[in-house]
Amino acid sequence: MGEIKSTLDLVLEKTKNLTLSSEEKEEQEQKEIENRIKGMMQKYQDGMLSKNQLKTDYEILKKDYNMSQNNTLIIEISKRIEPDQDNRPLLEILQECCTIDTAAIETIIENFRKAYFEASQNRIKRLKEDLALQYNITGSAVLPNLAADEQWRQEAREMRAGYVDQLNRVKDNLLGGRS
């Protein structure tokens, strides 16, 4: 009577003589690097990894994989930068681990915040005026709900998209001159 083999045993038996090409090995190694960096950055953003520990782990990773450039880290951090979020921890890592000047990114984010605040205040003012004219509702206690205002949500989405485009152009340039 024959031996009953598991699917894993059958697959291993069929593939035991296969080897990876050098391209496949490089691709697999790059994927492993990307996943490790992604994991480190997520832990850092979640507060489970301090900045110093992240820097130490990253240096070990660079040594383990003989990495001379920081492109993978730059790309991962770039993906995480958003104009309406607190990006200081990410920008600090870009500055300290990758020696990148983040002034352009910081300027775009600051400009977004100022424009967003100003636009929201203007919209609140317009909504208060509309309430006063249409319903004769006035007073210091009147505070329109911007989240419920479709016109504001559309305006905010468009404003954010414009700043995201600016950020993306700057982020694309981060790898400029680095290979």
Regions flagged by a language model, labelled:
Residues 2, 15-81:
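N-terminal interaction modules that seed assembly of large macromolecular complexes
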Residues 11:
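Conserved structured catalytic cores and adjacent interaction surfaces
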Residues 23, 27-30, 34, 51, ...:
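Amphipathic alpha-helical coiled-coil segments with heptad-repeat character
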Residues 26, 48, 120, 124-127, ...:
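Coiled-coil heptad-register positions
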Residues 54-144:
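Charged linear interaction tracts used for macromolecular binding and regulation
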Residues 141-179:
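Alpha-helical oligomerization segments
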